[in-house]
């Protein structure tokens, strides 16, 4: 969902000539999606927020010079966001979209203020992932899911170090060993197919060690330098920062569709460029 939003927004900026359509599409679509992403994927939620922040920073002058239009945009986006919370609040959030009759009815009976409070209450456990703390040489989180992933990522580093594989990694012929650790059952998931660690960067490091990780960083740095040399700006960050942030917290890059779409679109943009600023 996050990548579809980002790609479609950039396509709109490139090909749709109407500045009003572009700016309303970007913010209203975000207003619709953010309540859903709060529950579905914290990484995707933050990715969309980062996209909005970067886009807004590039267009501060437009907002300053169009106060009336900015006020209308904020009002419409806010209304859409609130209405979207009703849909989310009436949905059984279990990564499938099953609508319970009682839940929908309960959500419908809430006022706007009560509904937002209900969303905030449900989101308290999601906010816990920000509650990180350090103890006995390791980082922990009060949020169970985040703590589970932090445990895996740190186990990868410790295991690589103990086996003197920091420089070359595990290779590609086996499941990352910490995923099959008998002292931490459940890491492979219910279907036993959970071979990776839900972090793009840790996966790269685990498979090829520091050497591969440095090559990866140099590759992506070279993309930014090529873009800067060709277009004399850093607007590519509108795509790369949200995607990399999301991939550092979630399993997005461990599938097939997400990386294919991302890298094909990245190549397309490098070849053709795009303009991030809305003309005044």
Language-model regions, residue ranges each:
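Hydrophobic transmembrane alpha-helices and their immediate junctions
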Residues: 67-69, 180-186, 207-243
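Transmembrane alpha-helices of multi-pass inner-membrane enzymes
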Residues: 52, 236-248, 252-280
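Membrane-interface helix-loop-helix junctions at transmembrane boundaries of multi-pass membrane enzymes
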Residues: 12-27, 60-70, 174, 221-238
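Long extracytoplasmic/lumenal interhelical loops at the membrane interface
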Residues: 138-208
């Amino acid at each position: 969902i996050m990548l579809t939003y980002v790609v479609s927004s950039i396509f709109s900026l490139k090909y749709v000539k109407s500045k009003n359509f572009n700016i309303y599409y970007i913010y209203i679509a975000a207003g619709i999606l953010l309540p859903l992403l709060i529950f579905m994927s914290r990484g995707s939620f933050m990715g969309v927020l980062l996209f909005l922040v970067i886009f807004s920073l590039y267009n501060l002058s437009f907002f300053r010079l169009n106060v009336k239009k900015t006020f209308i945009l904020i009002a419409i986006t806010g209304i859409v966001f609130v209405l979207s919370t009703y849909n989310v609040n009436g949905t059984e959030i279990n990564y499938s979209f099953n609508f319970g009759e009682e839940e929908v009815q309960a959500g419908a009976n809430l006022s706007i203020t009560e509904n937002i409070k209900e969303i905030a209450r449900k989101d308290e456990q999601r906010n816990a992932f920000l509650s990180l703390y350090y103890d006995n040489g390791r980082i922990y989180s009060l949020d169970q899911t985040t703590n589970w992933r932090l445990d895996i990522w740190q186990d990868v580093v410790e295991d690589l170090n103990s086996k003197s594989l920091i420089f070359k990694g595990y290779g590609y012929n086996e499941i990352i060993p910490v995923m099959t650790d008998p002292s931490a059952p459940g890491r492979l998931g219910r279907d036993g197919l959970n071979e990776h660690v839900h972090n793009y960067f840790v996966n790269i490091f685990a498979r090829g060690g520091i050497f591969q990780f440095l090559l990866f960083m140099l590759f992506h740095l070279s993309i930014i330098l090529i873009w800067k040399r060709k277009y004399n700006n850093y607007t590519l960050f509108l795509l790369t920062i949200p995607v990399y942030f999301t991939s550092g917290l979630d399993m997005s890059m461990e599938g097939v569709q997400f990386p294919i779409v991302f890298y094909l679109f990245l190549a397309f943009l490098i070849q053709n460029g795009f303009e991030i600023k809305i003309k005044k």
